[in-house]
Amino acid sequence: MNSGPLQQVTFRSFATADRDPLLKLWRACDLTRPWNDPEDDIRQCLANSSSALLIAEQDRRLCGSVMMGCDGHRGWVYYLAVDPDCRHQGVGRALMAQAESWMRERNVPKIQAMI
């Protein structure tokens, strides 16, 4: 387990090539359930202009994600995930800050986390 300050992490939008490593991350973080298809969640997110899926990378390796959506008044955070090898470095906190910024840009006054 790593611990210490946040190492160089970059944030960007999801790309098609992220699909397999992202699904692997979500499984490693125990975020998938048999009754909910995560690939369908990705498709719906990408098809909706009021949703976004951000990827965190460290040394060109996917180390985290956050999916968010809003209805104009309320925002939701889903699939907040940090690779177990990248935890305790501030990646999750930085992903939440990115989600909060995304919500502020859309004048969304409330955020709910789907856990």
Which role fits each region the language model picked out?
Residues 55, 61-69, 76-81:
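Conserved beta-strand in the GNAT
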Residues 103-115:
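Conserved GNAT acetyl-CoA-binding A-motif
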Residues 8-22:
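A short beta-loop-alpha structural element at the N-terminal edge
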Residues 33-42:
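A short, aromatic/hydrophobic, helix- or strand-capping loop or linear motif
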